């Protein structure tokens, strides 16, 4: 079916919205246009004094870069860190860096020994009340084209503390210095892996105390030895671990005595899964991060990556629902066996089909307007009183949940107990499942078969075959 990024209402103003609460955009299900509009507005806002951005991959016709050049031409300080070693985009980045410099932007070319792979934007405003910030931290590139093909997450906030941390990161990048201290932000190589290992230790300690601890990790690849060993330790401690890993995976799931509580799946669908979400549940609270970096050693130790801990309960709810949806996927998913092979996930008899990617459109369809389902859910959860003795009476028996749903709920007890979550996923299954398996479908009308004439290619010389081979290799 046709799928297009969902657009906000015509009067939607991201810069104004972020002053009310943090915002999370999910590409390609939601359009990148609000972010571009925010940059263009900042380029002409008299209160904006500077825009700083890290650029790794850009579109060949980039509205984002055009907005930066407009800002510089309007007298604002524009700092762009362009990574010239982005594989396959070297020439494109060189061309854009020249145009940025010509427009009056300050262009930084990063470190000699570290690639700057982070996705970070900082808009600084000065008014009568003082300085204020709008900070954007993402998992994907500032590329309008790939934002319609890759699944990524973009966190935008006006939190002053995060703005100060982002400003510190840019100051360090300007003098080729690594960031050593941060609170809510993850900044590799010094404040990325160490923070995530601390989060895992917190969950392991909760498991030793008998709490229902769990970890959910979604990224592209994992090879870092320290993280793998910590995951094994968590599994042996009884922590339920669910991993969604699209690419390289150097840890095996379900190995008795080592990773028997670790479950790994890969999602390959219409869009390239590119987002990174790291969720840690200690039996009482969820601490969740999004980041630009995977768990490859090159990301954790050899690159400048940036992530952030999301604290807005609405966005924590939203990210948790996204993870749960992907753990319920039985259309695009393949699960790892203990021998390292993968087996396609097939729905059980009578179980509804759940396509995690197409289901995102239903999950986010009302996200631009108020009240958001997650904001309403969080408000109900905060105001809900303690259950009384009468309220604790057993409810009528319900139809037993499908196996995939049980597994997803077990991986994160907090999300399973949250109000409205089950109803929303029940509706989601009905919307995503376009055709019920039990309903007979009429056979499509047969089309007449046309004869196809296949021409026999002329014989090629050995030299011609070699040249054609190298053309294909390109």
Q: Predicted segment positions?
A:
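N-terminal localization/anchoring segments of enzymes in phospholipid and broader phosphate metabolism
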Residues: 1-215, 224, 233, 237, ...
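Hydrophobic alpha/beta core scaffold segments
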Residues: 240-244
